Structures are given as C-alpha cells and as structure tokens.
Amino acid sequence: MLTSGNILLAGSLLSPEPGLIFWTTITFVLVLIILKKIAWGPIISALEEREKGIQSSIDRAHGAKEESEAILRQNRELLAKADAEADRVIREGREYAEKIRAEITEKAHQESQKMISAAKEEIEQEKRRALAELRNEVADLAVRGAEKIIRGVLDADVQKKVVDSMIQDLSTNRN
C-alpha cells in the first residue's frame, strides 16, 4: 500500500488540478512581488554599482594608458633633445679645441719667427762687431807694420820678419 500511496501522490502532482495551478501562480506572483520589493532593488543597484565600478576602472585604465603614452612620448622627445644637445656640445667643444689649437699654433709660429728674427739680428750685429773689430785690428797691424817698415831697412829679410811679427801679433791679440 505504501507503494500505491507513492504512486497516488506522484500522480496528483503530475495531473494538473485547477486549485493547485491557482495557488502555485498566486505563490509565484507573491514571491516575485516580495523579491521585487525587497531583493530586486538591491540586486539591481549592486549590479549597477558593479557596472559603474568596472566602467570607472576601464576609464582609469584608458586614462593611465594615455598618460603613460604621453609620458613615453615626452621622454622620447627629451631624450632626442638631450642627444641633440650632447651632439651640439661635443661639436662646439671640438670647434673650440680646433680654434685654440690654431691660435696656439699661430702664436708659436709668430714666436718662432720673432726668435729667428732676433737671432738673425743678433748674428748680424755680432758679424758687424766682429768685422769692425777685425778692421780695427787690421788697421792697427797695418799701422804697426808701416811703423816698423819706416823704422827699419826695407830689404826682403826685414819685410819677411815684419810680416811674421805682424802674424804673431795678430795671433796673440786674438787669443
């Protein structure tokens, strides 16, 4: 009988009875109304909040991406400017070094020309002084020779002695 009771009970659930359908519908509608009043609002607002939070996160992510791209562009521009500035500084340094080298070379050339000119002038003065001294000595020797000739006899032996004497005088005066 127990078996037949289960079948009977199962049969009553499967067979549509108007009272059961009515009360099931009423219960379903009441549950929907209660859920709409109590749970539907908070669920929808939670979903909307969640959607707003996700949208806000997406917007912030887009903003951060754009900002990072802008910073990256700015960094690249700054790097390019720094490279250009470094190239300019190096170029100016090289130009300045070349200018200084040229100035130093020119100054050294001028100094060497001055030194050469001064040395030539000094050599020329020494040469003139030596020639003047030599002329004076030759004149002195000539005067002494003439004096000796006038005092002595003019034969060949005397002349030879006078010349030898003048040569010796010249040698001793130079030393």
Swiss-Prot record:
Q: Which domain of life is it from?
A: Bacteria
UniProt-listed SUPFAM superfamilies: F1F0 ATP synthase subunit B, membrane domain (SSF81573)
In which compartments does the protein localize?
Cell inner membrane
Q: What is one term from the GO cellular component aspect held by the record?
A: plasma membrane
User: Topology with regard to the membrane?
Assistant: Single-pass membrane protein
The membrane spanning regions, by residue number, are 20-40
**Which keywords describe this protein according to UniProt?**
ATP synthesis, Cell inner membrane, Cell membrane, CF(0), Hydrogen ion transport, Ion transport, Membrane, Transmembrane, Transmembrane helix, Transport
Q: Name one GO molecular function term.
A: proton-transporting ATP synthase activity, rotational mechanism
Q: Does the keyword Transmembrane apply?
A: yes
Q: Which family does it belong to?
A: Belongs to the ATPase B chain family.
What is the recorded function of this protein according to its Swiss-Prot or TrEMBL entry?
F(1)F(0) ATP synthase produces ATP from ADP in the presence of a proton or sodium gradient. F-type ATPases consist of two structural domains, F(1) containing the extramembraneous catalytic core and F(0) containing the membrane proton channel, linked together by a central stalk and a peripheral stalk. During catalysis, ATP synthesis in the catalytic domain of F(1) is coupled via a rotary mechanism of the central stalk subunits to proton translocation.
Which PANTHER family does the protein's record reference? ATP SYNTHASE SUBUNIT B, ATP SYNTHASE SUBUNIT B', CHLOROPLASTIC
Listed under subunit, the entry gives: F-type ATPases have 2 components, F(1) - the catalytic core - and F(0) - the membrane proton channel. F(1) has five subunits: alpha(3), beta(3), gamma(1), delta(1), epsilon(1). F(0) has four main subunits: a(1), b(2) and c(10-14). The alpha and beta chains form an alternating ring which encloses part of the gamma chain. F(1) is attached to F(0) by a central stalk formed by the gamma and epsilon chains, while a peripheral stalk is formed by the delta and b chains.
Mind telling me what this protein is named? ATP synthase subunit b 2
Name of the gene encoding the protein in the UniProt record: atpF2
